[in-house]
Amino acid sequence: MVSLSTSTSHAPPLPTNRRTAERTFTVRCISISPREPNYAITSDKSNNTSLSLRETRQSKWLINAEDVNERDSKEIKEDKNTKIASRKAISIILRREATKSIIEKKKGSKKLLPRTVLESLHERITALRWESAIQVFELLREQLWYKPNVGIYVKLIVMLGKCKQPEKAHELFQEMINEGCVVNHEVYTALVSAYSRSGRFDAAFTLLERMKSSHNCQPDVHTYSILIKSFLQVFAFDKVQDLLSDMRRQGIRPNTITYNTLIDAYGKAKMFVEMESTLIQMLGEDDCKPDSWTMNSTLRAFGGNGQIEMMENCYEKFQSSGIEPNIRTFNILLDSYGKSGNYKKMSAVMEYMQKYHYSWTIVTYNVVIDAFGRAGDLKQMEYLFRLMQSERIFPSCVTLCSLVRAYGRASKADKIGGVLRFIENSDIRLDLVFFNCLVDAYGRMEKFAEMKGVLELMEKKGFKPDKITYRTMVKAYRISGMTTHVKELHGVVESVGEAQVVVKKPDF
């Protein structure tokens, strides 16, 4: 790996140059591995929390009288905070509904307040509610005070690109021209993004050539970076090289974002030679230096591939060159150590985060909950699940999948029932991956009635089983020797279309 260091100092395994905060925040955690000792966080006399390693033959949850009092006090506080949060949430919802009601009632009115309409439009653009956003935009154009604004058009076109609506984006582009707006390179870049995000590369290239032939709308590094990212997402690496060559001919030099996009894509594709070559090119640029995104992409590439030693070496070199880690860095380290079964080092990262008061995100909780679930430490997993809720971090579908998988491995069908009851009392948006995890968990426990019941639950929630669903059921029946059921499902598997499931990766 190329050296990144700009100094002769040797970086420690975890950074030590961050100033300790005055306010303490205690997170109790125990790392347990079937082959590793039990690790617990304890507090010393100087109030600096640390992780002490305590070896035990069995996983034990240590609770004394002080812990009970502390827990009761915390539960009262959590209940109070929950009520306050609920009142605030209701207040926000009521304000939004009032705004929506005003917009709906005054359709056709030409005297709405600018702030009311613009805030409503901004809210819908941010939430990617493209149909509603277009409706509000049409209402905006009817107002007496309306004047065409290029910035609003650009935001709408970018939103439509993210929502895979290139035709609508093109319609807005034409309307913008009809209204007399001056089309600049930012508008063209937004439309290029809309085309490329939907895989309409021919249209994107046609627009790129039009930009190159114009005098005042020349493509810039941002335009090329968007195209490069779109091609990398479909693994069209040859097209990426063509774009890089075209950039050089145009006299456009890649920036840090361009290089980071390439490094991240090569890492995900496990093309480590190309990834390192790109990093070397980046280091050769005078005005293009690696940053935390560069470090995180590199660490994720090696850590995700199980190359823990290489990941640690890269971490040291990046840090010795002056690049500070952030919460995403630690999430990557936790995920890599957890999946490789190195709970000792995972605990060291948790200790460091606690010592220097890095606030945990939902990704952090999802990573450690999954790790403890894999290790079979259900008590610690459940403690973290409660803790994230007390910290007002609402569980996601990823969180629930980790819980269901862990309970399935431990044959805790009643616990899975608890997860389902939790879902019924929440507004978590489920996905097909969750239901497939549920099928797998019941299949492992030979709970075939409950496994079939998942299909009914899927239909109730508006989901259709895919090939993964049925293949998981076939596997469970085959292991139990239920050949009749296996034969019945084989025909169903072949008749079902290929799975269209997009697994959301952690936002490291």
Curated annotation (Swiss-Prot):
Stretch forming the transit peptide: 1-28
Q: Where in the cell is it found?
A: Plastid, Chloroplast
The positions making up the signal sequence are none
The PPR repeats lie at: 149-183, 184-214, 220-254, 255-290, 291-325, 326-360, 361-395, 396-430, 431-465, 466-500
Q: Is Plastid given among the entry's keywords? A: yes
Entry GO MF terms: mRNA binding
Q: Could you tell me which species this protein originates from?
A: Arabidopsis thaliana
Q: Quote the Pfam families the UniProt record gives.
A: PPR (PF01535), PPR_2 (PF13041), PPR_3 (PF13812)
Polar residues compositional bias, start-end:
1-10
Q: Where is this region: Disordered?
A: 1-22
Question: Which key words are in the record?
Answer: Chloroplast, Plastid, Repeat, Transit peptide
Protein name according to UniProt: Pentatricopeptide repeat-containing protein At5g48730, chloroplastic
GO CC: one term?
A: chloroplast
Similarity comment text for this entry: Belongs to the PPR family. P subfamily.
